[in-house]
């Protein structure tokens, strides 16, 4: 997560202007909350959110019966998150949890902030209990990236570049995150192979965010586990202390 300093600098803007309100009241035009409900599902025990930011998804996770905890590299973002959930400042490539200790892990709109996302997925597989569930919700690699101009709501202009892994701060708007902190693009096969290489088995997919979707979501499981579709898994996690 190489964008720590950038997020520290924009944490207040992100909380008060980009989100526009608290985790219980902000608009959700991309349908992220519904995706969390659909793919994470009801369950018990700890749910770790990687790259939790200001903790905007905390209420949704709690409503599913789970106990949210979060990690992020940005101290500025965690300054807002602490009022919502227990947090720790940590690198997602070195999670402060024991092997096989967590029944659920969640990552929402963060993989483009993590150039080492395959390493993050390996850490997810390490900390998940057998059959544990991982929900990835992220920018759709086919329709959103430096190669896709979405400035006209009626059409998307796609330029060459989809097949090239790249990082960019180019953006069609100055109201979003990309022009402030940048974004890393991975083609869809590379992203899905990273799940498989980490030992995570995708079992469900969803898209949201418009007729040409902005968001691709995946539910995957670690090896050996519960019946698909239950949304629960054995094991309990140990939450990090607040910092």
Segments the model singles out, each with a brief description of its role:
Residues 93-105:
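A short acidic, Gly/Pro-enriched loop at the edge of an enzyme's catalytic core
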């Amino acid at each position: 997560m190489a964008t720590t300093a950038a997020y520290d600098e924009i944490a207040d803007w992100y909380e008060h202007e980009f989100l526009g309100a608290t985790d219980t009241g902000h608009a959700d035009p991309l349908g992220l909350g519904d995706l969390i409900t659909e793919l994470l599902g009801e369950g018990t025990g700890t749910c770790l959110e990687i790259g939790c930011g200001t903790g905007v998804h905390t209420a949704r996770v709690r409503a599913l019966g789970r106990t949210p905890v979060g990690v992020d590299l940005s101290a500025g973002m965690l300054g807002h998150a602490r009022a919502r959930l227990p947090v720790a400042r940590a690198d997602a490539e070195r999670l402060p949890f024991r092997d096989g200790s967590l029944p659920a892990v969640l990552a929402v709109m963060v993989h483009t902030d993590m150039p080492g996302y395959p390493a993050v997925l390996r850490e997810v597989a390490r900390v998940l209990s057998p059959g544990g569930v991982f929900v990835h919700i992220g920018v759709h690699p086919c329709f959103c990236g430096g190669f896709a101009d979405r400035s006209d709501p009626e059409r998307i202009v796609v330029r060459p570049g989809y097949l090239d892994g790249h990082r960019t701060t180019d953006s069609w708007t100055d109201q979003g995150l990309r022009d402030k902190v940048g974004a890393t693009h991975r083609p869809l096969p590379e992203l899905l192979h990273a799940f498989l290489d980490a030992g995570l088995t995708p079992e469900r997919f969803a898209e949201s965010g418009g007729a040409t979707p902005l968001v691709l979501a995946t539910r995957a499981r670690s090896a050996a586990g519960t019946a698909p579709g239950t949304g629960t898994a054995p094991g309990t996690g140990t939450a990090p202390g607040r910092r």
